[in-house]
Amino acid sequence: MDTKQIWFTTLGTLQNQILRYDYDTWLKTTALVSVANDLAVIGAPNVTTKQVIEDRFMSVLRRALGEVLGYQVNVRVIISSATPAPSEPVAVTPSEPSPTTEVAEPSFASFNQAAPMLNQLPLGDPNRSSVLNPRYTFSSFIVGTSNRLAHAACMAVAEHPAQAYNPLFLYGGVGLGKTHLLQAIGNYALDRNPEVNVLYVSSEKFTNDLINAIRRQQTEEFRIRYRNIDILLIDDIQFIAGKEGTQEEFFHTFNTLHGAGKQIVLSSDRPPKAILTLEERLRSRFEWGLIVDVQNPDLETRTAILRAKGETLQVPVSSEVIDFLAQRIQSNIRELEGCLNRVIAYANLNRTPVTVEVASAALADLLDTSRRKRVTADDIFREVSQHYGIDQRAIRGRGRSRNVVLPRQVVMYLLREETDASLVEIGELLGGRDHTTVMHGYNKITDDLTSDARLRNDITSLRQRLYGENAR
C-alpha cells in the first residue's frame, strides 16, 4: 500500500476509537507524509492541530498505524501545507468491539435536573432563547481558512456540550463572526433539544444584571439565573476587566457551571493573556480549555461571503463587482457586507445596474484613504500595548526581552506606515534607538507579513482599532 492507502485505512480504524467531533476537528485534515525506518510522519495543517495531536492522540495513532502496517512504528507530527483531506474513509468494524470504543450519544437530560424553570426567574428576559438571532446558524456561516478551526470547535461544543472544549475561548477583531458562532452554538443546541437551557449575553449585560440585582437586593435570584443553565455564551468578555465586583461574581459563576459540567463559551477581541487588568485567577480559567483565534477573511472567503450575501438579498451582483469589493475591503465581514448593502442601495436610488463604476462611486469616501482619521504615535503605542499585553514603558525602553521584541517591531512598522515620522524620529520615540535599528525592525515585520498569518491578523486588528471599522 502507498501512503494514501495506509492513511485512508488508518483513519477508518480511528473512527471507531475516538469521538466523531475529535476526528472531524483534528484528524480529518491530516495526511501521512511518509513511513520509513519504523517512523511514520504525519502532516498537520497548522500549529494548533499539531499540538493537539501530540497531546491527545499519539498513542491511539501508533496503535492504529501498527494494526494497518502489521508492525509498530513511532509517530512524528509536522506542519505541512500539503495536507488535503482524503476521501471519507469507511469505518473499519472490529471483529470484537471493545467497550472503550463505544461512545454513547450524550443526553441533555442530566443537565436539567434540579434546574428551575426559566419563566420562574425574575431577572431579565424569561425566554432565554429569544435573544438568539435565528439567522445566526452554522449553515449560514461561511467557512474559510481564516475561521475553519473556530467553526469546527464551535460545532463540536454544540454537538457535545461540556465534553469537548470547556471553556471555549474565541478571540479576534471586530466583525469577524464571533457573535455569529456563539449564537450558532445556542441555536444548534436548541434545535437538537428545545429543553436545553441556553443563555447568550454580552459581558455588559452580565454587569448590568449584577448591578440591578444589587440595587434591588436580588443577588440570590441573579445567581440562580446565571448558575442554573446548560450553555453559557458570553460575548466581549474583555469588558469585565478592571471591574472588580463583576470579575468576582463571574469567577464564582464560572466555577459553579464548570464544576457542574456545564458548557461555557467566551469571545473577546484579544487572547486572555492580552486582557489587561483581568484577574489572574480568571485568566488561568479562560485558558483551561481551547483558545482559538478568528482571523481576517482571505480573498477567497471574502468572495464567498459577498456571493452568499448577494443571494440572500436576491440582487444580481456580477463577478466583477464582487471581485472589486473583495479586493478592496479587507478589514472584516461586517464592513464587507455593509459595503455591499451600500452599493446596492446606491444603485437602487439612482435606478442603475450594480456595476464596478457604481460600486466605486458608492464607496468613494471609504476607499479614499486620505479621509481616514489621523493616527498619532501615542495611538499606536497604546493599541500595541493593549493588543500584546505589554506595558508601554517596556516597549519604549531599552530592554531586549523576547516578549517585548515583537511588539516593539510592530510599533516601528506602524509608525513608519501610518505616520509621517522619520526613521530618526521613530528611534527617538523608542528610547533613542539608531535609525538603522528602526529600519531593521520595519523590514523584519514587512518580510514576515508575507508568510505569518497570525502577524497579518495582528496588524489588521491593530489598524481596525486605530482607524475604526473602516481600517484598510
Curated annotation (Swiss-Prot):
One of its GO terms (cellular component) is plasma membrane. Residues 348-472 are annotated as: Domain IV, binds dsDNA. Keywords: ATP-binding, Cytoplasm, DNA replication, DNA-binding, Lipid-binding, Nucleotide-binding. Residues 1-80 are annotated as: Domain I, interacts with DnaA modulators. InterPro entries: AAA+_ATPase (IPR003593), Chromosome_initiator_DnaA (IPR001957), Chromosome_initiator_DnaA-like (IPR020591), Chromosome_initiator_DnaA_CS (IPR018312), DnaA_C (IPR013159), DnaA_dom (IPR013317), DnaA_N_dom (IPR024633), DnaA_N_sf (IPR038454). Pfam families: Bac_DnaA, Bac_DnaA_C, DnaA_N. Residues 131-347 are annotated as: Domain III, AAA+ region. It is found in: Cytoplasm. ATP binds at G175, G177, K178, T179. Residues 80-130 are annotated as: Domain II. It comes from the Bacteria. One of its GO terms (biological process) is DNA replication initiation. GO terms for molecular function: ATP binding; ATP hydrolysis activity; DNA replication origin binding; lipid binding. Domain I is involved in oligomerization and binding regulators, domain II is flexibile and of varying length in different bacteria, domain III forms the AAA+ region, while domain IV binds dsDNA. PANTHER family: CHROMOSOMAL REPLICATION INITIATOR PROTEIN DNAA (PTHR30050:SF2). Plays an essential role in the initiation and regulation of chromosomal replication. ATP-DnaA binds to the origin of replication (oriC) to initiate formation of the DNA replication initiation complex once per cell cycle. Binds the DnaA box (a 9 base pair repeat at the origin) and separates the double-stranded (ds)DNA. Forms a right-handed helical filament on oriC DNA; dsDNA binds to the exterior of the filament while single-stranded (ss)DNA is stabiized in the filament's interior. Oligomerizes as a right-handed, spiral filament on DNA at oriC. Belongs to the DnaA family. This is Chromosomal replication initiator protein DnaA. The lineage of its organism: Bacteria, Bacillati, Chloroflexota, Chloroflexia, Herpetosiphonales.
